């Protein structure tokens, strides 16, 4: 009997109490899943495997689930499976119904009010299924899954909106924009 996937809530609580960080890695094929989980096993580290929209399109949901199930069985590590940057309710629902233990709903391209409404909808569904939800407030510059957010269109998270957003949505965690960016960059 293999260990089940765990939620990020359980992981974060243990990490907070133990004073350590947990790596979150985007995966899209067997070699990446194996490399990450084998490295984590060497140091007995819990980890979060993240799946983007591009990875779901490339590798397909069923294949990714089997890879992650094999990783949990092979390593015996606490592993959470997280949807990275879900863009709408439908994608979040599909991942929740399909066995993910955590989803991110990225409503940051919407108005503050619409972001709250969308995030709240995902939270209500996810929490009924024991799934953790990460929201996003503010927009990171850069490129991720062919979504290009220019520096002009990026926005820092407004600290004055954070408390209201968390209270109104019920999110379990929050991604904020504080000057970080997505993508691979070549430095000269």
Predicted features by range, described:
Residues 19-21:
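Terminal or standalone catalytic/regulatory effector modules within metabolic enzymes
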Residues 1-2:
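Short, Lys/Arg-enriched N-terminal segments with co-localized hydrophobic residues
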Residues 6-14, 29-55, 61-78, 86-188:
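Alpha/beta enzyme core
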């Amino acid at each position: 009997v293999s260990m089940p996937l765990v939620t990020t809530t359980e992981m974060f609580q243990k990490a907070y109490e133990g004073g350590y960080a947990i790596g979150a890695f985007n995966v899209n094929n067997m070699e990446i899943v194996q490399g990450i989980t084998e490295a984590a096993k060497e140091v007995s580290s819990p980890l979060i495997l993240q799946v983007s929209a591009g990875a779901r399109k490339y590798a397909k949901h069923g294949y990714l689930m089997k890879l992650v199930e094999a990783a949990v069985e092979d390593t015996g590590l606490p592993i959470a499976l997280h949807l990275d940057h879900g863009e709408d309710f439908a994608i979040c629902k599909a991942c929740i119904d399909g066995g993910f233990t955590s989803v991110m709903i990225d409503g940051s391209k919407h108005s503050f009010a619409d972001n709250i409404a969308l995030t709240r909808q995902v939270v209500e569904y996810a929490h009924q299924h024991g799934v953790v939800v990460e929201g996003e407030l503010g927009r990171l510059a850069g490129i991720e899954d062919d979504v290009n957010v220019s520096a002009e269109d990026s926005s820092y998270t407004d600290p004055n909106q954070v408390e209201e957003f968390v209270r109104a949505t019920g999110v379990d965690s929050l991604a904020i924009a504080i000057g970080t960016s997505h993508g691979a960059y070549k430095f000269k």
